[in-house]
Design a protein with these regions (language model features):
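Low-complexity, Gly/Pro
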Residues: 2, 24-26, 337
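Alpha-helical transmembrane segments
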Residues: 14-17, 277
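Contiguous beta-sheet cores, especially beta-hairpins with glycine/small-residue-rich turns
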Residues: 154-330, 334-337
Length: 337
C-alpha cells in the first residue's frame, strides 16, 4: 500500500507538470510581477508567509521541502506545476491541500487552513505518531493518509444547494479602531457541512468577509457602527462558494438564542439587515466599540454550487454530525435530498 501511494504521488506530480503551458519570459521579472506573486502564494501555503531572496533559490527550497527534489523545466513551468499540485490536483488525484484537510479532519474532526502546510503536518504527526517525522511534506502527507485512511482519498463531485445555511464565528475581535473599510475579515465554520455523506467543508473551514462601513461613536449620543458584508465559504479543495446573509440565514440567526446572546453582549441594540438593506451583510450599532472574537453569524449560499467532497467511508461515518443544515438551527450539519 505504501509503494502504491508513492507511485500515485509520483504520477500526480508528473501529470500536473505535463499539463503546464509554457508562459512568456516576461512573466519572470524582478518587478513583483506574476512570477513573484505565484511564488509568494506557494510560500504562503507551505510556510505561512513569503520568503526573501531570489526566485530560483526560493523555488528550489520550496520544491525540496514539498517533493524532496527540484522539478525540471523553466521557472514558470515549475511554479505552475507546484501550485497546481498544491491547490488543483489532477483529473485522477485531488490536490495536496484537499488530502491534507481530509487527513486533518480524520484526526481531530476539524481543520486549520490558516496554518502553514508544514505546521499542519507537524501537528498531525505529533498526534498520530508521537513526534514530528522528517522528509518531504507530500510524502509525509501520504504516509499519514495510509495510516488513517488506508483506502486513500479521492474527490467526489457534489452540489451544494442554494440557501444552504451555515454557522460561523469571528476569528478575531473587531473594533471601530482596528478595522477600516475594505479590510478582510475571517470567520470559521462552527459545524461541518456534509452532503449525502460527502464531507464538503469541515469544522474550521474559513468564511471570508470584508468591512463596508466603520463609524465611531458620534456627538448627540449617536452610536458606533460596523458594517460587514460576507463573501465566500472556502470548502476543501480549496474552492470558494459565494455566501451572504440572506433571509434564511437571518431567520436562523434570530432563532438561535446563543447567537442573539453573543451579539447582544458585544453590541447593545444590534440591528440585522437582510440582503435588500445590506447586500447580504450585517450591521451592528451600539454604544460598545467592539465585536468580540467568537461572535456567531449565520450565512447562506447565494446559489447552487458544484464542488468536490470526500465520500466518508462507512466505518468512520459516525464521526459526522447528522441533520439538515438548511434549517434554522445551531446543531445539524448534513444535507440529504
Amino acid at each position: 500500500m505504501k509503494l502504491k501511494n508513492m507511485l500515485m504521488l509520483a504520477a500526480a506530480i508528473l501529470t500536473v507538470f505535463a499539463s503546464v503551458t509554457v508562459s512568456s519570459a516576461s512573466d519572470v521579472g524582478a518587478d513583483g510581477g506574476p512570477a513573484f506573486q505565484t511564488l509568494e502564494r506557494i510560500e504562503t501555503i507551505v510556510y505561512g508567509s513569503p520568503k526573501g531572496g531570489g526566485l530560483l533559490s526560493r523555488l528550489n527550497t520550496a520544491e525540496k521541502d514539498v517533493f524532496g527534489r527540484e522539478l525540471p523545466g523553466s521557472l514558470t513551468e515549475r511554479q505552475t506545476a507546484m501550485l497546481d499540485f498544491l491547490e488543483k490536483g489532477t483529473t485522477t488525484q485531488p490536490s495536496l491541500l484537499f488530502k491534507l484537510s481530509v487527513a486533518e479532519w480524520a484526526v481531530s474532526q476539524q481543520i486549520h487552513p490558516e496554518w502553514s502546510l508544514a505546521r499542519r503536518i507537524d501537528t498531525m504527526e505529533t498526534i498520530v505518531e508521537g513526534t514530528v517525522q522528517g522528509g518531504a511534506l507530500a510524502s509525509r502527507t501520504e504516509r499519514l493518509i495510509t495510516k488513517l485512511l488506508p483506502e486513500g482519498v479521492l474527490a467526489t463531485p457534489v452540489e451544494i444547494p442554494a440557501t444552504t445555511v451555515v454557522k460561523t464565528s469571528l476569528s478575531q475581535t473587531l473594533t471601530v479602531k482596528n478595522v477600516k473599510v475594505d479590510d478582510k475579515v475571517v470567520l470559521k465554520l462552527v459545524e461541518e457541512i456534509v452532503i449525502n455523506n460527502n464531507l464538503v467543508a469541515p469544522k474550521g473551514s474559513r468564511v471570508f468577509a470584508h468591512i463596508t462601513k466603520v463609524k465611531p461613536p458620534r456627538s448627540f449620543g449617536r452610536p458606533s457602527e460596523i458594517e460587514m458584508a460576507f463573501d465566500a465559504l472556502e470548502v476543501i479543495g480549496p474552492n470558494s462558494v459565494t455566501v451572504a446573509m440572506g433571509e434564511a440565514a437571518k431567520k436562523a440567526m434570530e432563532a438561535d438564542a446563543a447567537t442573539v446572546g453573543a451579539v447582544g453582549a458585544s453590541f447593545a441594540g444590534a440591528v440585522l439587515l437582510g440582503p435588500l438593506g445590506l447586500a447580504g451583510g450585517f450591521l451592528v450599532r451600539g454604544s460598545d466599540n467592539h465585536l468580540k472574537e467568537g461572535t456567531l453569524f449565520y450565512v447562506e449560499t447565494t446559489s447552487a454550487a458544484n464542488v468536490h467532497g470526500y465520500m466518508i467511508p462507512s466505518q468512520i461515518s459516525s464521526m459526522t454530525v447528522s441533520g439538515d443544515v438548511t434549517a434554522p438551527q445551531g446543531t445539524s450539519s448534513e444535507i440529504n435530498p
